[in-house]
């Protein structure tokens, strides 16, 4: 676990840069995510990931002759607090904003940044979203200034349900999700896609619970047991996943789990406690055990430096593509960066090609369905020192993950 005092020290100073970066004439990236409160476990790992990437890029000379500098801001997973923090970031000279945890936060930031850009021509900002996956952000609420590197929740559910439709042992499914825009999107997509692909499956429960406020999931697990479900689908993340699985372990609940974020901090430990060996599945853009030499070497270096696994291959794609776009544009102007990112094709962290769709600024990339359990000789990494690690069950090429968009974007004139 990353020291909270370590993070707090850098938040207090407002700077977390590559080791050789200096404050003046750097490419400032404001990292706005939870560094305190219930979401801090994932926010801290995200911050270290961006620190690692700043160091990596700066060691290669940065971009357009400038070094990268990470400015951390604690939003406490709160949309209103995020708007306070983004204004602070702008005041400190940041014109590149990144955030990932919480689609309600993402929606607030995207709207604020779009309006800021309208009011401040020539001083525009760009928002790089590495993990907030409500589909609306690249559909009805798309903006030119917003780019997303994680697959949206509909893309992920499409992949999961395509796999699930072939699993004939699935008869009864229980949905449990966080009660905000993302969780609501997960339940909607799961219900509609299961009905279309496996109409014989019964949805025996559909539960929403408060975001990052539940400390004991035992009552929810009791409902799942009583329903007779053989399978649970959840988009829960951070402590809402870890505590949910801990309660499942305590109750001896023996079901299959189809998840988005089983790999988040605390998740693998809770999964191991359930004893559900390769019965907890996740849809991800990669994993430590993908057979790819370059990413496994980076994984090893990341773990040696921080003592945690790399949960954000998408952040690697984002930062490396940002550097490529800056070099292509030969400019750090956000509008020019955005134009350079559009339709960019890129070799992704775990191998294979991804592309940034111009129509809506959604990044498409190879996706993996993985399960957590005992590791074999071709799976070198475990998770959270549990002895369990990821195994690839299915891989989808980027072209096979594409869904249509309703985005009607106002573009720079």
PLM segments and residue spans:
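Bacterial N-terminal signal peptides
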Residues: 8-17
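Sec/Tat signal peptide C-region and signal peptidase I cleavage site
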Residues: 18-23
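Beta-alpha junction/loop-to-helix N-cap segments that form part of ligand/metal-binding clefts
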Residues: 26, 41-48, 60-137, 149, ...
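Solvent-exposed, acidic/polar segments of extracytosolic/periplasmic ligand-binding ectodomains
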Residues: 27, 346-413
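Extracytoplasmic "Venus flytrap"
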Residues: 30-51, 73-80, 101-102, 176-185, ...
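Extracellular/periplasmic Venus flytrap/periplasmic-binding protein
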Residues: 80-84, 135-136, 144-252, 288-297
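Periplasmic-binding protein-like
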Residues: 89-103, 120-130, 172-177, 228-238, ...
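Extracellular/periplasmic periplasmic-binding protein-like sensory domains
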Residues: 143, 245-319, 327-332, 376, ...
């Amino acid at each position: 676990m990353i020291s909270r005092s370590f993070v707090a020290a850098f938040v207090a100073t407002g700077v977390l840069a590559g080791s050789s970066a200096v404050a003046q004439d750097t490419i400032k990236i404001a990292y706005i995510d939870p560094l305190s409160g219930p979401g801090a476990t994932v926010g801290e790992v995200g911050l270290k990931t961006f620190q690692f990437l700043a160091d990596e890029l700066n060691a290669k000379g940065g971009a357009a002759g400038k070094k990268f500098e990470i400015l951390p801001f604690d939003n406490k997973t709160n949309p209103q607090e995020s708007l306070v923090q983004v204004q602070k970031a702008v005041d400190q000279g940041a014109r590149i904003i990144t955030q990932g945890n919480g689609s309600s936060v993402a929606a607030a930031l995207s709207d604020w940044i779009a309006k800021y850009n309208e009011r401040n021509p020539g001083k525009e900002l760009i928002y790089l979203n590495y993990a907030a996956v409500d589909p609306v952000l690249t559909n009805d609420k798309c903006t030119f200034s917003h780019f997303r590197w994680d697959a949206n929740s509909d893309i992920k559910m499409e992949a999961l349900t395509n796999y699930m439709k072939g699993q004939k042992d699935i008869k009864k499914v229980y949905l449990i999700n966080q009660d905000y825009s993302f969780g609501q999107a997960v339940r909607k997509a799961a219900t509609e896609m299961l009905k279309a692909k496996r109409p014989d499956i019964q949805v025996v429960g559909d539960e929403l619970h408060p975001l990052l406020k539940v400390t004991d999931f035992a009552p929810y697990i009791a409902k799942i047991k009583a329903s007779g479900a053989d399978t649970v689908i959840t988009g829960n993340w951070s402590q809402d996943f870890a505590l949910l699985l801990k309660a499942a372990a305590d109750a001896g609940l023996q079901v299959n789990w189809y998840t988005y974020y089983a790999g988040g901090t605390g998740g693998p430990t809770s999964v191991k406690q359930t004893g559900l060996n390769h019965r907890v599945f996740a849809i991800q853009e990669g994993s430590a055990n993908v057979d790819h030499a370059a990413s496994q070497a980076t994984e090893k270096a990341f773990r040696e430096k921080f003592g945690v696994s790399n949960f954000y291959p998408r952040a690697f794609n984002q930062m490396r593509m940002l550097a490529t776009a800056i070099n292509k544009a030969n400019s750090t102007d956000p509008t020019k960066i955005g134009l350079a990112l559009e339709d960019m094709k890129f070799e992704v962290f775990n191998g294979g090609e991804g592309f940034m769709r111009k129509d809506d600024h959604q990044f498409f990339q190879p996706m993996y369905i993985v399960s957590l359990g005992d590791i074999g000789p071709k799976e070198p990494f475990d998770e959270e020192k549990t002895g369990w690690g990821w195994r690839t069950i299915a891989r989808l090429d980027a072209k096979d993950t594409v869904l249509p968009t309703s985005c009607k974007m106002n573009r720079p004139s």
